[in-house]
Amino acid sequence: MSQSWVPAVGLTLVPSLGGFMGAYFVRGEGLRWYASLQKPSWHPPRWTLAPIWGTLYSAMGYGSYIIWKELGGFTEEAMVPLGLYTGQLALNWAWPPIFFGARQMGWALVDLMLVSGVATATTLAWHRVSPPAARLLYPYLAWLAFATMLNYYVWRDNSGRRGGSRLTE
């Protein structure tokens, strides 16, 4: 019996694994600290973040499956589009420990700018292989722009809080 669904499900779920690991930092003391910060009025309610990230992670994960399948697996030809994807995913997963764990809002902002750049490069690389896979990243790019602005305003408005006024430690 062929289990051709396994790569589709596996690659779709991979981004969420890092999201679950990052959730470790977004609880307890990290949440209390974040709740104490000044945030802009357009800050989304906390309950919306899990569904948003779940949807974005699933879309990017399925997009990676499309690229993987189109290029015949983890081939030399897949190195750039899947390598960029892996790089942006690692940078994405690094954000919660930087922001909530280390409370380094400035460095978290730098991380988000890097994620945005590498995610844009990923989208362009994917578009050459599969425009539908690239389109699955469009909502993610929009969310990254929003998240970057939110991170900036939180950093700016909380200067002097732990990690709020400095980029270097």
From Swiss-Prot:
Membrane topology listed for this record: Multi-pass membrane protein
Residue intervals on the Cytoplasmic side: 27-46, 101-105, 156-169
GO molecular function terms listed in the Swiss-Prot or TrEMBL record: androgen binding; benzodiazepine receptor activity; transmembrane transporter binding
Tissue: Highly expressed in adrenal gland.
Taxonomy, superkingdom: Eukaryota
InterPro entries: TspO/MBR-related_sf, TspO_MBR
Pfam families in the cross-refs: TspO_MBR
UniProt keyword list: Lipid transport, Membrane, Mitochondrion, Receptor, Transmembrane, Transmembrane helix, Transport
Any single Gene Ontology cellular-component annotation: cytosol
Mitochondrial intermembrane side: 1-5, 68-79, 127-134
PTM annotation: The N-terminus is blocked.
Subcellular localization(s) per the UniProt record: Mitochondrion membrane; Membrane
Sequence intervals crossing the membrane: 6-26, 47-67, 80-100, 106-126, 135-155
GO biological process, one term: chloride transport
Subunit structure: Interacts with TSPOAP1. Interacts with MOST-1. May interact with STAR.
Family: Belongs to the TspO/BZRP family.
Its biological purpose: Promotes the transport of cholesterol across mitochondrial membranes and may play a role in lipid metabolism, but its precise physiological role is controversial. It is apparently not required for steroid hormone biosynthesis. Can bind protoporphyrin IX and may play a role in the transport of porphyrins and heme. Was initially identified as peripheral-type benzodiazepine receptor; can also bind isoquinoline carboxamides.
Protein name (database record): Translocator protein
Organism name: Rattus norvegicus (Rat)
Gene: Tspo
